[in-house]
Amino acid sequence: MKKHLLPLALLLSGISPAQALDVGDISSFMNSDSSTLSKTIKNSTDSGRLINIRLERLSSPLDDGQVISMDKPDELLLTPASLLLPAQASEVIRFFYKGPADEKERYYRIVWFDQALSDAQRDNANRSAVATASARIGTILVVAPRQANYHFQYANGSLTNTGNATLRILAYGPCLKAANGKECKENYYLMPGKSRRFTRVDTADNKGRVALWQGDKFIPVK
């Protein structure tokens, strides 16, 4: 997959193989008509967990994205930022965007630090045990421009995002290659200024369908 395209899982970094904390979708979107977002997290283990959450602004949600400064200290807020989560319990984390209302799309990494509560309460003599029982999970939050301009071009099986907000694009229908079966489906996130050609679905076939989401609005393309 080309580097400039966003697959359905935008980014996942530093995750422990034995993940105890369920943070839901790896990528979340705050649409242009909303300034709040809620994510439900769940402790799927039989022991309490200490959860700490940190926010970082990114230049890009792709692998080469760099941490950059926020335009203002309270650009993106969350609550709670730290909590004790009992075994098999859930909690709703709320995010509030208070940044510029301009035409720029913004990207943030939500860093979840997950630690077994029993380990977190140990003294410094047992710090090595804490490290092995801890996890750092990275998910992505995309804040659509407050002044979103949704535009696209489609030709010969290729979609180009000519607007300023990320699109969710999809194709479904007959498979391009018989080895893939009869029916195929593709889903991607397409950033502003990028193009995507579908490689599994035969979009040239009369039964091939292409569509996209502009925020919460479904748009048939073909």
UniProtKB/Swiss-Prot annotation:
Gene3D superfamilies documented for this protein: Immunoglobulins
Domain of life: Bacteria
Pfam short name (any one): EcpB_C
Keywords carried by this UniProt record: Chaperone, Fimbrium biogenesis, Signal
Conditions for induction: Negatively regulated by H-NS. Positively regulated by IHF and EcpR.
Signal peptide: 1-20
InterPro entries: EcpB_C, Ig-like_fold, PapD-like_sf
Bilayer-spanning residue ranges: none
KW Chaperone (keyword) present: yes
Functional note: Part of the ecpRABCDE operon, which encodes the E.coli common pilus (ECP). ECP is found in both commensal and pathogenic strains and plays a dual role in early-stage biofilm development and host cell recognition.
Family in the record: Belongs to the EcpB/EcpE family.
Full protein name: Probable fimbrial chaperone EcpB
Record lineage: Bacteria, Pseudomonadati, Pseudomonadota, Gammaproteobacteria, Enterobacterales
Gene: ecpB
